[in-house]
């Protein structure tokens, strides 16, 4: 047996087998074998960490069995490498010091110096920078004296890394280039790949983006060619950071996720933690504050445990930014103070300046503009000295925006103009769009409408360009959430124009900021559920399915009556179950987000889908009017679109007052939620109370627009924020309910409505009718049985037949999908709003997965199925979104808990008219009017609303 074969077998063996191998091959068990195992450990470190640690373990055992000094020294060296891989930096330093001492004792000064290459990494990661540089320079002299070009280059590379960590970029570049020259002489692809990654990062920090990208591409090609997996991950991580820096969020998420997966697969804890820190930074850029905060909370203790102070400080500082985004002022202050102390202990003035910049953001979010200016100005000098343009530009924008808010127009313009110029020169669109928005506000404040409009339009163009490539609807919606100001201001400018009627243009800007992520899905620009591209993603999908099964069990436990006789025990049991549910839902969301990091979505044109007013008017025809609500400064206004034109009705009332009135109405409706029969004798009085609130809402929301819509037109309502919960069809004018005079339907936006209208109607030949009764809905079975004969063909799934698998199987053939089962709206986690099937729950994400391209109508005859959370940009998050995304053009859903018996009667009447040829809106209106005669309280007849066509 050759030594190489013995080494390979020792690495793969367990300890007992290793002892046997060493004893049976004693002639080969010498210092040469120890050096061979040490070399394997060093070589495998960057490509196969498991093999490297295997070599270290074999050497450790070998040293116990052999008293040779060189064997022990090699074992200590390899133990240091294994500790580095495990993230145990202080232990790595101890082992490498031991190795150096043993080699020096053997009078092997050159080999002793070579051990310091690895020691520099450990010293730097625990913040012992001066010691590391002194150690490195000392070792460099010895290595140069012995002509060891490779080890000397590694030392220079690591010294460069130390200067980089201290944000001293010129010194870092000097050592990187010196090391690169040595590696080029040796034509060492492995070292060149690692070195070019570092050099590229320095170039990106200096805003030499083209040079950085060329170096990254070159480094990644080398690393892939030689199979250096760790180096590949490091380069992909760096490329992700560059993309994030440039606002190319799709590439950033994709590269960062690739790196995280590689580190996780190789079991490298400190690299995995750094990778998660970088993904959290990407989330923060996309306004996913809660998600970013969770990552920061997870990795900060890891960095503390590993004594990685620089990374811990960065995590704390960015966690502070997330807290600002979440409105947690005190928490942000505490986190930033802690980060500042760590940076001070590191002697990192630039890190302290970053914290000061974040403090300026905290003051700005609190409206303390004088403090904003002071903090931003304090941060500028060290940021400028380091050439950190992105953060410097953010500090300057904050100073300019604070000056604008304080009314210092001249100072604000000077700062903002200069900042915009530099942001464009440095390719920083994130800062540029902020500057354009601020300059637009400044121009508007000064009465210069033309300049304001130009600035706002440029800001909108940049926002939509940045948003276009994002790979998932959640990322697009969250990114948009704090960028609505220029859209609102363009609406304001259009409406203020006294020379030209720009109502249609104003509506166009409202639409560009409304339900855009849903529009992207309907327009085919987003895949909601991409296919797995590798085994890793396939395993993630398996985890999702396992979590789904666990959740179904917990949901069933929560929804069944408690077996505990003691109320306190029952409450504790319920709290424990709900905690289990929250943990699993959270994990599902995290895995789903991880799957969506991929950068393979079709590119979305920055030219967003614009509302074609003329086409909308043509589709509405003579008998329909679209009423779209929005608000400016908390005051509601409405756009009315008919075939005759576009009108704007302003000063309808304050959003706050409408929300208060709506809350009172919900209280009245909920009075009957838990049993109408026992309240029957009070129904006339309760009806009168409900009417009072319905009339008040009518007076605010519809009375002022009646003259613009005429007496005969049916209404399509596009609500705004809380108005999504208003039953417009049940509003009362003092004589009649609105539904008594006209048909009413709803849409998330005018563009979404146009997508629904673009579907050619199909005959309703085949219905899929699903009925899963429970204690709250005992009439469901009767409801479904009564509906089946109304259709030429019907697939009926009752009781235990009503499974999610069966719905998925039969839905693609259905013209109508009717789901009669218990529904649950989850305001705490709206994506987990669900319908209870026989064996599990159909959530929003399950609805996404259904194939409803043939389906004309989805009807959900259950409680609160039409409720949605309304995210910024009027993004509806609930069951409606799921079914729209799956392809349904029309949805029949409820706004509140429904009465089982009343629902059964209404559905039968509705479908009789629908199957006889009536439109869905007409059929629903007549069914509601008929039920109104028998059950006058709106609780019974008005919960159902029609979304879409």
Where do the language-model regions lie?
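Catalytic cores of nucleophile-dependent amide-cleaving enzymes
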Residues: 748-753, 758-760, 765, 773-778, ...
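Short coil/turn linkers that connect adjacent helices within long alpha-helical scaffolds
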Residues: 27-28, 64-68, 85, 104-110, ...
